[in-house]
């Protein structure tokens, strides 16, 4: 698995170095390309160049693919490739997949992989369609690409955005601070993607029969609800005096 991650990161860095990957059509230093590739695959969102203004459409596509691979997991991506190529998945590969997603048993791994892929692309598609009206309103036809990019980035919890411009410093989603649609869609994508595939497998399989959920799913759902609700209420309480104080 480690070698797989390293290989994907290195390949991504080499591609991002190419002039076609930048808006200025110049070579990117290896350390900058390597940092960007690592950040994308490991879905950290840290950048040394603004993603929206520095990278070309090709470069942004490479970054998005790296984010998607990182979000799915290298092993999941590899198993997906084997499935699409029609090859049989060996017991060793099934065991690697089991370890990668913390599945309780090896049996049903192929079914679970299909569920992961279908679920991922379905949620990302719905997210992109929901964001489409806003981004197309503001950016025209380019809004289609922006909706897709931010939907995938949010679902994979990657933190990358392409809203930056050469004359501004990393604005991210600050322009949409008062837009409820963008805020709600991005938040839901982050939560759905962050909960994990096994938890959603439980939700889709057992519905409201919570007692049938895996212990892991119960802990994740409870912890997610608490860690979202308590800080949100705390921030509302802390910011309330500030909003009431008149500005001199």
Model-assigned labels for residue ranges:
Residues 1-248:
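Membrane-proximal intracellular helices of multi-pass ion channels
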């Amino acid at each position: 698995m480690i070698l797989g991650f390293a290989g994907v990161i290195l390949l991504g860095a080499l591609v991002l170095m190419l002039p076609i990957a930048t808006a200025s059509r110049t070579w990117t230093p290896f350390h900058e390309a390597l940092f960007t590739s690592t950040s994308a695959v490991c879905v950290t969102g840290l950048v040394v160049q603004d993603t929206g203004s520095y990278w070309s459409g090709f470069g942004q596509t490479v970054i998005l693919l790296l984010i998607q691979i990182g979000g799915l997991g290298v092993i999941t991506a590899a198993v997906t490739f084997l499935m699409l190529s029609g090859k049989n998945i060996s017991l060793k590969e099934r065991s690697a997949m089991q370890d990668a997603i913390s599945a309780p048993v090896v049996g049903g791994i192929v079914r679970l992989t299909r569920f992961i892929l279908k679920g991922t692309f379905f949620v990302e598609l719905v997210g992109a369609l929901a964001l489409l009206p806003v981004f197309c309103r503001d950016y025209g036809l380019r809004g289609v690409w922006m909706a897709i990019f931010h939907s995938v980035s949010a679902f994979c919890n990657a933190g990358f955005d392409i809203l930056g411009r050469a004359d501004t410093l990393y604005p991210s989603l600050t322009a949409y601070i008062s837009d409820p649609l963008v805020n709600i869609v991005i938040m839901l994508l982050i939560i759905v993607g962050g909960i994990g595939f096994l938890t959603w497998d439980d939700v889709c399989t057992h519905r409201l029969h919570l007692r049938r959920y895996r212990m892991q799913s119960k802990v994740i759902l409870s912890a997610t609800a608490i860690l979202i609700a308590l800080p949100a209420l705390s921030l509302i309480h802390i910011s309330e005096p500030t909003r009431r104080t008149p500005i001199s």
